[in-house]
Swiss-Prot record:
HAMAP family: PSII_PsbT
Quaternary structure annotation from Swiss-Prot or TrEMBL: PSII is composed of 1 copy each of membrane proteins PsbA, PsbB, PsbC, PsbD, PsbE, PsbF, PsbH, PsbI, PsbJ, PsbK, PsbL, PsbM, PsbT, PsbY, PsbZ, Psb30/Ycf12, at least 3 peripheral proteins of the oxygen-evolving complex and a large number of cofactors. It forms dimeric complexes.
Organism: Euglena gracilis
Name of a matching Pfam family: PsbT
Name the UniProt record assigns to this protein: Photosystem II reaction center protein T
Main location: plastid
Length: 31
C-alpha cells in the first residue's frame, strides 16, 4: 500500500512540474 502512495506522489510531482513548465511556455508558443 505504501508503494502505491509513493508512486502516486512521484507521478503527481512530475505532473505538476511538467504542467507548470508547459503553462509557462504556452503563451510564448501561442504568440
Amino acid at each position: 500500500m505504501e508503494a502505491l502512495v509513493y508512486t502516486f506522489l512521484l507521478i503527481g510531482t512530475l505532473g505538476v512540474i511538467f504542467f507548470a513548465i508547459f503553462f509557462r511556455e504556452s503563451p510564448r508558443i501561442n504568440k
